[in-house]
């Protein structure tokens, strides 16, 4: 049996346009509505079955996100919910816990309840997973991705962060301040930033010391605390540290305090994201600001315009900013 995506592909319009046309929305012109209904009949699609199934999904947007425990994802969820509400959508949120199986199930669930649009926040590597890509292709809703860096599959709208330029800015800042022994800490989920860290160091002509790169399974402040403990146990620790994200930086600073050490006098600390706590700790954490508000605003605006027969997906890169505070 044909589905909404088949009709959309046949006519060269968005899935949301097909959905609204079949539901008799006044936002869709009479000519487009007739064209969609004719195509649905030709392909053997049951409009009556669709109306019954879609009732719960009318004017509903889905949000899929890995977790809500970290400040970064909690901020994105709140921003997305507020922006979608302002556009007249009610929202349904699903968590994946960074698991492929949970992501596939979440996408399938959103498709089954016929949400009109779906905002998925995930890492670029995760978004390239074959199971996840296939689930997105089967989904009956318009999809917007928010990812950590460039996403090569152009069939989906995507807002992505230019992580590379941000990390280069951060390392260059440390270099200009005279730091030479620069380390990096991360958890396994954010380990892609270590790869970029190494690339940035090489670009700037700096030496990467393998012993100064610490990765563990623990996340958040606890992960940062434990990784800093490892570095401080060395005979010669680094004189500056890039943390994969701000909550790890906060944990690293706690470990320094326990040893009566301070940033930047004993070790400079730089984070990534610019979460709320980064503005207050230690007089302010130097960090690479992720433009979350811009990301969500652009993403929701594009999703809302999907009903206007826009045919091609968009890939939009946003550059982060360096926020210099007292820890460097």
Language model region names:
Residues 71-86, 166-169, 189-208, 223, ...:
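Short, solvent-exposed amphipathic alpha-helices that sit
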Residues 229-328:
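Flexible loop/turn connectors
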Residues 41-78, 87, 110-112:
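N-terminal helix-turn-helix/winged-helix DNA-binding helices
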Residues 121-169, 207, 247, 273-285:
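Flexible loop/hinge segments that line or gate small-molecule binding clefts
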Residues 1-57:
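N-terminal helix-turn-helix DNA-binding module of bacterial transcription factors
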Residues 168-204, 211, 314-327:
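An alpha-beta-alpha
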Residues 115-123, 144, 183-186, 235-245, ...:
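Periplasmic-binding protein-like
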Residues 157-184, 195, 199, 221-230, ...:
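Hydrophobic alpha-helical segments within soluble ligand-binding/sensing domains
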